[in-house]
């Protein structure tokens, strides 16, 4: 997976034309270690656009990745949800009083944002610099009151766990590691294509889970595809849906 830097060779540039966003574009170009408005942008696979209306990413195939919690284009609201009866809420221990969650892999924020709607307070960690930039802007622009207190960190999840153990008060840890996408003939929507190209999959997922299980929390929940093996042995209970399941490890 892309680490918390772009030194691994991710080909990305930052593009901006409006004068009012110049300073923001300079800041993000510095953060991403990417050139701003290069003479030959076609040489870069990913383009990070900074515009007055917001930021977004396009790849060379013109596929779009945008994070906007108010547009709900990625079904952030999940209308018709069952509230605390949702599998993810049950897995995290809402019935046991769990309220403060550490999300180790925010990604596009779909599960994190949903958890805030269910009444959880969420601390999120994202190690892809591009996704972090998109998320940071989305949280800054959102009008949703439930997201105003969201705490987002740019960090490698494994290092974050090691450095912050005992320093954060959380009831449960949530982890949704990326897994290899094998069915190339059935590509998902364009956002997921760009997302997977950006972040790949989590080679260190089992190490992250091992470290998470050392934290003083009530439980650790791992989201898995229905047919996938347990990330580590010791699952106390699995909350199974049609496509995914939530493996729960009881810690304390």
UniProtKB/Swiss-Prot annotation:
Specifically methylates the guanosine in position 1516 of 16S rRNA. It is found in: Cytoplasm. Its EC number is 2.1.1.242. Keywords: Cytoplasm, Methyltransferase, rRNA processing, S-adenosyl-L-methionine, Transferase. It comes from the Bacteria. S-adenosyl-L-methionine binds at residues 126-127, 176. One of its GO terms (molecular function) is rRNA (guanine-N2-)-methyltransferase activity. The lineage of its organism: Bacteria, Pseudomonadati, Bdellovibrionota, Bdellovibrionia, Bdellovibrionales. This is Ribosomal RNA small subunit methyltransferase J. It catalyses: guanosine(1516) in 16S rRNA + S-adenosyl-L-methionine = N(2)-methylguanosine(1516) in 16S rRNA + S-adenosyl-L-homocysteine + H(+). The keyword NAD does not apply. CDD domains: AdoMet_MTases. GO terms for cellular component: cytoplasm. Belongs to the methyltransferase superfamily. RsmJ family. InterPro entries: 16SrRNA_methylTrfase_J, SAM-dependent_MTases_sf.
């Amino acid at each position: 997976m892309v680490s918390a830097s772009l030194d691994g060779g991710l080909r990305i540039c930052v593009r901006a034309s409006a004068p009012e966003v110049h300073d923001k574009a300079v800041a993000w170009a510095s953060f991403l270690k990417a050139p701003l408005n290069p003479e030959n942008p076609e040489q870069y696979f990913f383009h990070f656009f900074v515009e007055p209306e917001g930021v977004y990413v396009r790849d060379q195939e013109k596929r779009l990745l945008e994070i906007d919690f108010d547009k709900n284009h990625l079904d952030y609201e999940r209308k018709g949800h069952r509230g605390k009866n949702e599998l993810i809420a049950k897995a995290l221990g809402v019935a046991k009083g769990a309220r403060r969650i550490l999300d180790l892999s925010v990604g596009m924020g779909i599960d994190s944002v949903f958890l805030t709607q269910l009444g959880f307070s969420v601390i999120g960690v994202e190690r892809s610099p591009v996704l972090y930039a998109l998320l940071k802007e989305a949280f800054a622009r959102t009008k949703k009151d439930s997201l105003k207190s969201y705490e987002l960190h740019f960090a490698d999840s494994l290092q974050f766990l090691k450095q912050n153990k005992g320093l954060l008060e959380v009831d449960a840890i949530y982890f949704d590691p990326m897994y290899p996408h094998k069915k190339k003939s059935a590509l998902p929507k364009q956002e997921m294509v760009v997302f997977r190209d950006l972040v790949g999959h989590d080679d260190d997922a089992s190490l992250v889970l091992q470290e998470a299980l050392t934290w003083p929390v009530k439980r650790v929940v791992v989201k898995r595809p229905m047919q996938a093996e347990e990330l580590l042995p010791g699952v106390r209970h699995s909350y199974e849906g049609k496509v995914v399941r939530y493996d729960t490890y009881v810690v304390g």
